[in-house]
């Protein structure tokens, strides 16, 4: 397995990953259409995404896993933390160390940038919760909330 940083050149591989995800589990909440691809492509030239860090796990010549994070700077305590936005592995590649390798690589890259805390919302499904409980030096605490700003 090879872990690589997600760059613009990887977009076709990631689009195929998204399609492979849907072939094995059809419950994802967004469509892989031209608008989606255009938005992802634009994110690589939009400075608003400069604090984003995404890694891809390649195996058998294709993307089988992905992890996405964003740096969060806070004047609350003058710290920089990171938010874990998403981690996902194609179902047929789960329980083979892919998610662990992605998480380890992300933690290493964040440490290199002086970030010592990664914060994430916990998915409601039990499989994801088992994964988070298995992470070394991690603890489940607090609760997350999604607040819609369109009111």
List where the protein language model places each region.
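Conserved GNAT-fold acetyl-CoA-binding loop/helix
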Residues: 22-42
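A conserved beta-turn-beta hairpin within the catalytic core of GNAT-like acetyltransferases
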Residues: 72-84, 94, 140-142
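Conserved beta-strand in the GNAT
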Residues: 56, 62-71, 83, 88
């Amino acid at each position: 397995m090879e872990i690589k940083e997600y760059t613009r050149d990887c977009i076709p591989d990631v689009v195929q990953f998204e399609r492979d995800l849907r072939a094995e589990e059809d419950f994802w909440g967004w469509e892989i259409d031209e608008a989606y691809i255009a938005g992802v492509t634009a994110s690589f030239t939009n400075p608003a995404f400069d604090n984003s860090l995404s890694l891809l796990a390649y195996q058998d010549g294709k993307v089988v896993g992905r992890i996405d994070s964003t740096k969060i700077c806070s004047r609350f305590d003058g710290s920089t933390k990171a938010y874990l936005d998403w981690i996902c592995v194609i179902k047929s590649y789960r329980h083979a160390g892919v998610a662990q390798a992605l998480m380890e690589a992300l933690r290493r890259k964040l440490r290199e940038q002086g970030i010592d805390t990664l914060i994430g919302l916990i998915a409601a499904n039990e499989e994801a919760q088992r994964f988070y409980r298995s992470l070394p030096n991690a603890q489940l605490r607090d609760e997350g909330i999604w607040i819609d700003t369109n009111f």
